[in-house]
């Protein structure tokens, strides 16, 4: 039996995105702190809203302190759906782990990045309950 299946669908393909939304109990849309990412997330938010699919946004690759991140968070919350409180930072541990075919949870389980991933997972699980 499978408890979770993650589908990584491109935001630019309306058909793929619609199929992924239909199959999901919850859609997580990662957004980097950039206006382009926010604008690219609008079609996904519109599809989710039109079909009444649950949607949450996760800020990803965030710098430690940047006003732009807060502005993008505000913009994401205005698109509809839920804005997850945890943020995943831009961490070297993620890239280094990927080079080994692993995750930061495996290579650096006590790192800030691993803690951020655990916090995001906990927030997602809470939405699914």
Q: What are the language-model segments listed below?
A:
Residues 63, 73-102:
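Beta-strand-loop-alpha "switch" segments that mediate conformational coupling across diverse proteins
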Residues 1-5, 23, 126:
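Catalytic phosphate/metal-binding cores of nucleic-acid and nucleotide-processing enzymes, i.e., regions
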Residues 7, 29, 57-59:
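Structural beta-sheet core signal
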Residues 10, 21-42, 63-65:
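Conserved Switch II/interswitch segment of TRAFAC-class P-loop GTPases
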């Amino acid at each position: 039996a499978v408890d979770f299946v993650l589908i990584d669908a491109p935001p630019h393909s309306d058909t793929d995105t619609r199929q992924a939304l239909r199959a999901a109990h919850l859609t997580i849309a990662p957004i980097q702190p950039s206006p382009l990412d926010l604008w690219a997330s609008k079609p996904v938010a519109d599809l989710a809203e039109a079909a009444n699919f649950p949607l949450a946004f996760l800020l990803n690759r965030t710098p430690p302190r940047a006003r732009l991140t807060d502005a993008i968070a505000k913009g994401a919350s205005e698109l509809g759906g839920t804005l997850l409180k945890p943020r995943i930072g831009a961490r070297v541990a993620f890239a280094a782990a990927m080079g080994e075919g692993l995750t930061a949870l495996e290579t650096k389980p006590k790192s800030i990045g691993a803690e951020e991933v655990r916090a995001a997972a906990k927030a997602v699980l809470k939405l699914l309950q």
